[in-house]
Design a protein with these regions (language model features):
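Non-catalytic surface loops within mature trypsin-like serine protease
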Residues: 5-7, 112, 155
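C-terminal catalytic and target-recognition region of SAM-dependent MTase-like enzymes
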Residues: 137-187
């Protein structure tokens, strides 16, 4: 027996209509954010933010936003489950959101279209006010004291030529300085 309760795959949280090349799945990003231990008072930075997935998932974690809050499920159409059950579950999830958290996120990307994409996705996700995003190359990046850096740089033949990749990784090595106070997670 097979019942599709979800409809669209659960890795789609409902906030990302558009993305850039080779985006990370929201669920994978959420798992990495968990490993990075982003909390309500964290400052999270993604110096190559692309469509903003790490920043948004960090905000969701820090603010206690339920991951499926902004999406619909196939089971919502089932007559066996009253519509009030879905409404009540969403209301409960909305009440659980920590709107007072000091969480902040900063995103940078060399591509101004990616910056705009991140802003749009964050707004759709309801966390736009917690993110600051600007166009900037990794070579200009300065570590923000006390921050958690999470980055998924373009890699391999899917995005860069070998020479470009080597140059990018060299810049990353010069600009990203992980420490106990400033952990860095690179995929």
């Amino acid at each position: 027996i097979y019942l599709d309760t979800s409809g669209v795959g659960l890795h789609k949280r409902g906030y990302r209509r558009n993305s850039n090349d080779a985006p990370i799945k929201e669920t994978l990003a959420a798992g990495i954010v968990d490993l990075a231990r982003a909390r309500a008072d964290s400052v999270v930075v993604d110096p190559m933010c692309g469509s903003g997935t790490f920043l948004i998932e960090s905000a969701y974690k820090a603010l206690k936003v339920a991951p499926g809050l902004r999406r619909n499920f196939a089971a919502e159409q089932w007559s066996q489950i009253p519509e009030t059950a879905w409404r009540n579950a969403r209301a409960e999830a909305m009440d659980a959101i920590d709107r007072q958290g000091a969480f902040k996120a900063f995103g940078f990307d060399v591509d101004d279209m990616a910056v705009e994409l991140t802003r749009n996705n964050a707004k759709k996700a309801g966390v736009g006010s917690k993110l600051t995003v600007k166009q900037q190359d990794i070579s200009k990046y300065s570590q923000i004291e006390g921050s958690i850096t999470i980055v998924n740089p373009p890699y391999g033949e899917r995005m860069l030529e070998i020479k470009e990749a080597e140059e990018l990784y060299k810049k990353m090595g010069q600009r990203l300085c992980p420490s106990k106070e400033n952990p860095c997670y690179i995929i």
